[in-house]
Regions:
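Internal active-site segments that recognize and position negatively charged phosphoryl groups
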Residues: 145-177
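Flexible, glycine/proline-enriched loop segments at strand-loop-helix junctions
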Residues: 75, 125, 132-136, 171
Length: 367
């Protein structure tokens, strides 16, 4: 069986799969985008804005993170996602305030730290301001990639900032008066952003109080975006609209963002909360199923003799071993477990690790 944990940061929710100690199946580590879309579907799957894999490190980090958007595409980084992963690590490993992790991501090494109040302070690294690093075709003007973008029905003055992933920030007078979804969808795929982009509409309430609405690349409207809040502050500072520290309000709640001295790393502080643990049903397992995830043999004895055989490699179009199918055997094992286990027992099994983590956290808070 494949267990998962669901966490959310300001309503931006993720399914986390633990693979630091026990190897995840190959079909999970390199997931089919269709499987990710199925998991994230809020009607026919579990529901989420993305899937996070916690994996062994490849370099000098404590672990490695891969994150996939709800549309199945892989993202370089996600601020809310990395806070959720850090909260998961703290809950799973019994860590206390002051614990700091070095997490490898495609955007570089990111370092979240657990605070005394349970929030996560994340060193997000320095912003990317050169157009080629974002990437964008917008010109660099006074240290910021910016210009006018033409849409079908309007022209918008925009600024682009990279936080390991691309962002475009559009200052507006009133967030409630813009055609958010139409402009957001158009800007995400605009030719000025060759890798597509996350889109943030910004209303400035005060130099230390900003408000944004988020159109996330690969996910659409979302309640929050941590890297987007960081990119927004950087753009607002360079446009002369904000100080180097501000509260950034999102539909899901506020984040505290700082860019000390307008140079070096951007710092993000915000919450992350456990929602529930679960076990994927056979219908939600990736297909073709990697037999190693169920400790089935990697090779099967066939009528022709000893032939190495792998479902994931050889059964792409149809089962090649109908009389001795590893996938069927694995599904039968799962089905036998489901048939022989009461609903209460399954619920207890699915919630046990979350209960243990929650109890440990409460014990630490009391101490």
């Amino acid at each position: 069986m494949l267990q998962f944990s669901k966490y959310q940061g300001l309503g931006n929710d993720f399914l986390i799969l633990e693979g630091r100690r026990a190897a995840l199946p190959g079909d999970v580590v390199e997931p089919d985008p269709a499987w990710v879309r199925q998991l994230c579907d809020r009607r026919f799957g579990i529901g989420g804005d993305g899937v996070i894999l916690a994996l062994p490190p490849e370099q000098q980090g404590d672990l490695r993170m891969r994150i996939f958007n709800a549309d199945g595409t892989e993202a370089e980084m996600c601020g809310n996602g990395i806070r959720c992963l850090a909260r998961f690590l703290a809950d799973s490993d019994g860590d206390s305030a002051g614990r700091r992790w070095s997490i490898e991501t495609p955007a570089g090494l990111i370092r979240p730290e657990l605070q005394q109040d349970g929030q996560l302070l994340v060193d997000m690294g320095a912003p990317f301001l050169e157009p080629s690093s974002i990437p964008t075709t917008l010109p660099l003007v006074d240290g910021l990639a910016r210009g006018t973008v033409e849409l079908a029905d309007t022209s918008l003055d925009v600024a682009a900032v990279g936080m390991g992933n691309p962002h475009v920030v559009i200052p507006v007078e009133d967030l409630s008066s813009i055609p958010f979804e139409r402009w957001g969808a158009a800007l995400e795929v605009h030719p000025a952003f060759p890798a597509k982009t996350n889109v943030h509409f910004l209303q400035v309430h005060a130099r230390d109080r900003l408000e944004i609405r988020v159109w996330e690349r690969g996910a659409g409207p979302t309640l929050a975006c941590g890297t987007g809040a960081c990119a927004t502050l950087v753009a607002a500072v360079l446009l002369g609209l904000a100080d180097d520290q501000a509260e950034v309000m999102l539909p899901g709640g506020p984040l505290q963002i700082a860019w000390p001295g307008c140079s070096g790393s951007v710092l993000m502080t915000g919450p992350a909360v456990a929602v529930f643990d679960g076990v994927l049903s056979p219908d939600l397992l990736p297909a073709p199923l990697d037999p190693m995830s169920f400790a089935a043999p990697a090779a099967v004895e066939t009528a022709q003799g000893n032939i190495s055989f792998e479902c994931a490699r050889d059964c792409v179009d149809a089962c090649q071993q109908p009389d001795n199918c590893l996938r069927d055997a694995a599904q039968q094992q799962v089905q036998a477990f489901l048939n022989s286990t009461s609903l209460d027992a399954m619920l207890n099994l699915a919630s046990e690790s979350l209960e243990q983590r929650t109890r440990s956290r409460f014990d630490r808070d009391i101490r």
